[in-house]
C-alpha cells in the first residue's frame, strides 16, 4: 500500500481476466478511515492497514466491486456503505448504510448516483468544504466502474455487455462536470492526478459521438 496523496492510500490486485489493475483506496479522515472497493492486501500486508485510524466504513461503488470486503469487515468491524438502488444487487451482503445522491459519508465524501452500469452505482466526491487536501488540490473524485483508466493513459468504459443500460450511463456521467475536481481516483485502471475534470470532459465528448 502506498500514499498516493496526503492521507489517501491505494493498493491493488491484478487478475488474469482483466487487462487493468483493480485498485482500492483508504481515506484517512478526522477520527476514522474509509475504504473504497477494497481488493486483497498486497502480499497479505495487513500491517499497513492496522496502523491506520479506525477503519469505520467500507464503501462499495457497485455490485461487482465487493472484492475482499468481507475479509476487511470481519477484521475491522467496519459498516458497509452502498447506493440504495444497489442494495438488492449486493445480496446476500448486508449493507449497513444505504446512501442516495448528495448524501455525505463520514462527513466528507459526497455521494454521486451514476446509474447505467448497474442501478445503484455511486461515485464519491471528496468535498473540499470538508477536506483540506481536496480543497488544496482543486477537488478529488473517486469512481468505481462508471469510468475506468484503460487503455493506459486514457479513460474508457467497461465492455458494453457488462452495462445494464449504456445510454443511461453516458447520460448520468454528464453530472460529473457539475463538480470541480483535478484528481480522478479510479478503482479500475490508472488514476489521473491532475487535470481530471478536463480529461473527463474530453472523454464525454467522444462518447457523445457514438
What do the predicted segments below correspond to?
Residues 3, 17, 47-51, 106, ...:
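Structural motif
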Residues 10-57, 90-91:
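Pre-active-site segment of Zn-dependent metallo-hydrolases
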Residues 1-3, 26:
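Short, exposed beta-strand/loop patches in secreted or surface proteins that constitute
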Residues 40-107:
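Active-site HxH/HxHxD metal-binding segment of metal-dependent hydrolases
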Residues 19-21, 99, 118:
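Residues that act as N-cap/strand-start positions at coil-to-secondary-structure junctions
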Residues 23-25, 101-103, 122:
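Residue-level detector of beta-strand structural context in well-folded domains
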Residues 6-9, 15-17, 32-35, 41, ...:
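Metallo-beta-lactamase
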